């Protein structure tokens, strides 16, 4: 199985499913109660209480990840991005790149709405600025087309260049 990071894992719903499919899952969330629930529902995965701003340090990654210490896939679901403090948004996106192995992918999904003001266009621009490729964008987990300016949900498939 792949080495997968569940960024903003909450109570471990996504990580549990990925672990059940045979992947090596590490979940990170800022809320210790949610991490305790994740440990309860999926004790064989690794669950860490931490802020995504501190992601590389918490995972023991200095500089950019290598094939030995990085993740092949990062999943960030559940509106995590929409609730980040404005000052931490781009650093968190950069951390996503830093923890991916060369050629690794990130799948990030979140919605717009009250209290969630990280504009999709800004998120995609931030991803490009920190060195991630934007490979695909969708307006749902069912892969409906993303329409800039009218979609209320974004699922972005990003990748760290292989070299």
Q: Over which residues does each language-model region extend?
A:
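Conserved class I S-adenosyl-L-methionine
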Residues: 2-10
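Class I SAM-dependent methyltransferase SAM/SAH-binding core
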Residues: 11-56
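A short glycine-rich, Lys/Arg-flanked "PGG" loop and its adjoining helix->strand segment in the class I
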Residues: 90-102
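Conserved beta-strand signature within the Rossmann-like core of class I S-adenosyl-L-methionine
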Residues: 103-110
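A short acidic, Gly/Pro-enriched loop at the edge of an enzyme's catalytic core
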Residues: 58-73
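Short alpha-helix
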Residues: 116-131
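Class I S-adenosyl-L-methionine
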Residues: 132-162
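A short SAM/SAH-binding and catalytic strip from SAM-dependent methyltransferases
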Residues: 72-87
């Amino acid at each position: 199985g792949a080495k997968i990071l569940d960024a903003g894992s909450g109570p471990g719903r996504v990580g549990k499913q990925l672990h059940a499919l045979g992947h090596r899952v590490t979940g990170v969330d800022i809320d210790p109660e949610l991490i305790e629930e994740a440990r309860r529902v999926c004790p064989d995965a690794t669950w860490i209480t931490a802020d995504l701003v501190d992601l590389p340090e918490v995972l023991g990654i200095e500089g950019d990840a290598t094939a030995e210490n990085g993740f092949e896939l990062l999943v960030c679901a559940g509106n995590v991005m929409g609730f980040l403090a404005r000052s931490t948004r781009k650093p968190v996106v950069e951390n996503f790149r830093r923890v991916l192995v060369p050629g690794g992918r990130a799948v990030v999904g979140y919605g717009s709405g009250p209290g969630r003001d990280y504009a999709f266009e800004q998120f995609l621009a931030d991803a490009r600025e920190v060195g991630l490729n934007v490979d695909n964008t969708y307006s749902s987990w069912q892969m409906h087309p993303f329409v800039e300016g009218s979609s209320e949900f974004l699922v972005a498939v990003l990748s760290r260049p292989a070299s």
